[in-house]
Amino acid sequence: MPILVTSASGTNGNGFGALLAFELDGRFRGTFIEDDRIADPRGLAVDTEENLLFLNSGTDRVLAISSDGTVVRDTGRIEGLNPGGGNFGPDGRYFVGLRSARTIIALSTSLDAAVEHVLPLQVVPFPRGFAFGHDGQLFLASGIGPNGQGDNAILAFTLGAPLQPSRLVTDPELSPLDLAIAPNGNVVVSSERPFGALDALASVREYDTKDGHLVRVFSPNGKAEFRKPRGLRFAPNGLLYCVALDEVVGFDFASGECLGAIARLPRLNGQALVFFPY
């Protein structure tokens, strides 16, 4: 099952500004789709019901892409959208983090209905990634923005209830970039602290969702460069993958062992990754 990676461009990184494809053995397959609507691509998620790839584009739109690399749905340009990460929620809708508005919205998978704000505007200083727990709870990483402002925390929300977010994680060594839910239900976060520093410590950190305590720290242990970690995804076989500056790094989640660079590409500047059969 190929790995698809969004490669940043512009202020988000000197990458290719494209959706790139790799084999699981690391071979680079090239650009998955050539389309002018895709520029500085960001979040990705797969709708397994329809086998469609949903992509957040820096052109202020969300696209749905078929397995043959064709855009089949398009929100059209939404003024000021500035999307970040994307994930499907328990109700089947596609949720998108907004960088400028600092909130999360929901879209129907048809991409032709009105946008719904599921959290208030400016709910965090800078959203860095989010995912839904096994019980439907929403976990949101609050990190440092490009201007150097923000905080470093993980918040928990119960949608549909009065808004009473709880600060799940306060870890002095954490500066989150993305967040995923592990098979065991815990929160897994990619981190670079201090954010943007040349000597930043990059890691993947696992937290218990009940009380927020740090369970484990995943480190490259010399098997990968692991600079500027960003998007996280679990593969169907349970391995954990994290995209970074010049590589995609794998971890055996059961043992915590780093598997090294699964794929390498100079200037990758990866933002998000998914596993998408095509």
Language-model features and meaning:
Residues 1-30, 276:
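An edge-strand/N-cap motif at the start of beta-rich repeat modules
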Residues 27-35, 70-77, 113-121, 163-170, ...:
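A short beta-strand motif characteristic of beta-propeller blades
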Residues 245-278:
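Blade-level signature of beta-propeller repeat domains, shared across WD40, Kelch, NHL, RCC1
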